[in-house]
Amino acid sequence: MKVKTRFAPSPTGNLHIGSIRTALYSWLFARHYHGKFILRIEDTDFERFDSKSVESILYGLKWLGLNWDEGPYFQSKRLERYKEVIKMMLESGNAYKCFCSVKELEDERIRQVSKGKKPRYSGICRNLHYRNYIANENYVVRFKNPISGQVTFEDKIRGKITFQNEELDDLVIQRSNGIPTYNFCVVIDDLDMNITHVIRGEDHINNTPRQINILKSLNAKIPIYAHVSMIFNEDGHKFSKRQDALNILEYCKDGFLPEALLNYVIRLGWSCGNQEIFSISEMKELFDLRKISKSSSAVSMKKLFWLNKYYINNLPLSYISNLLKDHMNHEKINLKNGPDLESVLTLLKNRHHTLKEIAQSSRYFYEEFANFDKSAADEYLIPENHFILKNLYKNIKKISIWSNETLSSLIKNDCIKLKITLRKISMLLRVVLTGNIFSPSISSVIFLIGKEKTLLRLKKAILFIDNKIKNINN
């Protein structure tokens, strides 16, 4: 059997982390068995259809590297095929037209609830051979579900699941406007596309027996089902693709790596011993539906940040640097005005969790800052440090060999001569060169900023203290 899986999102909102997991599991299963992965866009909900969501889905999957072998197929382009099957089912007696009005159905529901019964369609139109109605009378088409027996399927994650047919409604498979419903379209799509394994969220479990019965009525082969548990956000609520902000595009914009996100997502329900870090090739080799937990998962941004930092520090420098360029451009930082980006990345990558953070924290290497941080200036740019800065300016100006080692020795020697701590002079230089008190090794910062810019910023700080002294004297 040639394995064939599918990812079938609805373009009605953002592609969120739960959707990404479904896509990843389906993709990995197909790749593990050297099968095919199909992309299908379920766009028959015309009222909520959002073309930007389609763009987001396609971009997100490409960014993650989840390439598809067929598609994208659009349900909206297959309407004639669905109607053809519905017509065939009407003729064979496996479906029927239901003329009950919305009011009739609501009255029926109220009566059932008042009697303590489970609301369901009574089947009043199920066996009608004719009815006096005007030509344009509205109707829906319902699937004639078996009224006895049971539906049993072996879920690859949850084991055997059984539903009694008497508990299942006669499903509407075509709306009154002539548009087929989701639960019908998905069955015909899976049938026509020869899908062998359906991997999806547990919220689809109740749809499965209805879909199986439709397939049986068509004498079709039943695919293998695997329903993964829900993912909850950090507040303990179910993710909503129309409410949660962190959709796939936001992860990308915020500087997360696709490798980190995939590694994070695969562990939301799947495990392989105590291993935490998985390359894409390892995921494809090790992925097994039997290792997916039945329990729900909860997102942890702390864990995702940790993984992202790991990949920033362990993937090839040239690869990370190339990705970082996009974030530098977004921050409008001109790379021509400063040091080699890979050198800056080497210095900063262990201090930050995302590419966006690295880009934002690297600005002082490429452009002058307008003002010193006020609290930092109040603490360090003070009259008693005036001489220290003038001495540093004089000594740095004399340097003929510009190297990290030379700068480090100069700073240490000044500490000895001036009888000040290395911490004090380092913090002072951080404020002078970056505008605040946070930076990597100060000698490395000076080296990358360069001699000319270092002297200019030292002069700026000296003048700042000069003005402060004048104000005190006045």
Curated annotation (Swiss-Prot):
Motif, 'HIGH' region: chain positions: 9-19
Keyword Manganese: no
Positions annotated to bind ATP: K241
Domain of life: Bacteria
EC number, as in UniProt: 6.1.1.17
UniProtKB keywords: Aminoacyl-tRNA synthetase, ATP-binding, Cytoplasm, Ligase, Nucleotide-binding, Protein biosynthesis
One Pfam family named in its UniProt record: Anticodon_2
GO terms assigned for molecular function: ATP binding; glutamate-tRNA ligase activity; tRNA binding; zinc ion binding
Subcellular locations according to the entry: Cytoplasm
Gene Ontology biological process terms from the UniProt entry: glutamyl-tRNA aminoacylation
Sections of the chain in a coiled coil: none
Residue span of motif 'KMSKS' region: 238-242
Chief subcellular location: cytoplasm
Catalytic reaction(s) noted: tRNA(Glu) + L-glutamate + ATP = L-glutamyl-tRNA(Glu) + AMP + diphosphate
A cellular-component GO term for this protein: cytosol
Family stated for the protein in its record: Belongs to the class-I aminoacyl-tRNA synthetase family. Glutamate--tRNA ligase type 1 subfamily.
Role this protein plays: Catalyzes the attachment of glutamate to tRNA(Glu) in a two-step reaction: glutamate is first activated by ATP to form Glu-AMP and then transferred to the acceptor end of tRNA(Glu).
Assembly notes: Monomer.
Identification of the protein by name: Glutamate--tRNA ligase
Gene of this entry: gltX
